[in-house]
Amino acid sequence: MMLEGYTVQPPQSTLIGDIEIQDENANQEVKNVLYQGVQKGIKRLEKRQRRVALGDVTSQKANKIHNAIHNKFHQTKNNFEIENIRSSALVKEQQRDVRHEDSDYFLIDSSEGSSTDDEQVNEDAIDDLLSRRVNDQQIQADEVYEDFDGEMQDVIEEDVDSQIEPLSPINNDEIQTELDRAFEKYFRSVPNPLDDDTHDVVMVVEYASDIFYYLRELEVKYRPNPYYMQNQVELTWPFRRTMIDWLVQLHFRFQLLPETLYLTINIVDRFLSKKTVTLNRFQLVGVSALFIAAKFEEINCPTLDDLVYMLENTYTRDDIIRAEQYMIDTLEFEIGWPGPMPFLRRISKADDYDFEPRTLAKYLLETTIVEPKLVAAAPSWLAAGAYFLSRTILGSNDWSLKHVFYSGYTSSQIIPLASLILENCKNASRRHHSIWKKYFDQKHYRCSQIVEEWIVSTEA
């Protein structure tokens, strides 16, 4: 069943990119070329210094020493593989020849079709790509992930036409009754003097209920169309997963906030809900969304030079700036999507802000960004599902009225979501490799390992 308010309608007929691939075999070749930038991209990525998040401006010398030590430590071969989603330099060069000069220069109206000259450019570019492909058949295997090439082949061969039905919480009279009971028991019009939050000015307890009521409105207002992929000509859900895998690694290298990553994915999905994007411009959309989100959420955000370097000069500073302008204009400057992190912190209040379930929930929550069924899911619901599952893994199987009050969801609404998250955590190193690898680190308390071991123990 489709979500209320959404129907499958063609978006505005605009294609990002100046060359449309007409020949099916040629299009397959371009998709194959898509994965050949892996080795170069990650080597350049690994050489970059890590950004010190929220660094003290008075300790720049200490930061330089830290970065020097860090870079020396990371001279070994990288443990992360990156999907550098890009077309060949030849195709990009041909695109620049036919760019528009206005603010939409990197866009082409799909209703206009391709001119004879453009078709000739396509044929020449593809012929060159095919000849270069014959001379470059060997791709080095990933040390950490030996089946990486096999996974990429699975992505190409996957049935991209299969229908993805979005998942959403159920609502009925019984659920509403339980929500009302929780509200009556725990809602206070006057702050509780025995609550520590009451005496913390940062928590603004007088306005907490109003704030989260407003955030619940925003999460509905800024949700993407869950069926937008049906209107994309060249993109598929597997390509979106590959893009997110790359963005997760870029986000990790820059040491950005979790809110920045979630907002980046929301911007990408909302933009794709309104515009049709070609494959050779998909990476530009992703990096521009990250740039926008970082400006919105961070104190220290990546510079244009940082992003151009990470893209291995596939795109220029001007490309990113113009793409940023166009995307913001398309979204009508509405980028204040709340994301799941405020809701996760709110729910943890039911357990007196217990560190363990909230930390484990961060890993489970991040895995949801690659799931097509959860593209339009409310972030408050995703946070509740991740927290519910984390408590279950840690041995707490109850979901009290207090949890219902602070989350806004009953256990019957959350269980289907928690089941989907758990299913996606099986064979996690293949389904969301970068997220799994990131949370396997001691810095993140090896959360992905904890989940893996729990799954094995329950299935034994």
UniProtKB/Swiss-Prot annotation:
CDD domains cross-referenced by the UniProt entry: CYCLIN_CLBs_yeast_rpt1, CYCLIN_CLBs_yeast_rpt2
Domain of life: Eukaryota
Gene Ontology MF terms in the entry: cyclin-dependent protein serine/threonine kinase regulator activity
Keywords: Cell cycle, Cell division, Cyclin, Mitosis
Listed InterPro entries: Cyclin (IPR039361), Cyclin-like_dom (IPR013763), Cyclin-like_sf (IPR036915), Cyclin_A/B-like (IPR046965), Cyclin_C-dom (IPR004367), Cyclin_N (IPR006671), Cyclins_cyclin-box (IPR048258)
GO biological process: cell division; G1/S transition of mitotic cell cycle; G2/M transition of mitotic cell cycle; positive regulation of mitotic spindle pole body separation; regulation of mitotic spindle assembly
Pfam families attached to this UniProt entry: Cyclin_C (PF02984), Cyclin_N (PF00134)
Record has DNA-binding as a keyword: no
CC annotations in GO: cyclin-dependent protein kinase holoenzyme complex; cytoplasm; microtubule organizing center; nucleus
Function: Essential for the control of the cell cycle at the G2/M (mitosis) transition. Interacts with the CDC2 protein kinase to form MPF. G2/M cyclins accumulate steadily during G2 and are abruptly destroyed at mitosis.
Note: Present with 98 molecules/cell in log phase SD medium.
Similarity field: Belongs to the cyclin family. Cyclin AB subfamily.
Protein name (database record): G2/mitotic-specific cyclin-4
Gene: CLB4
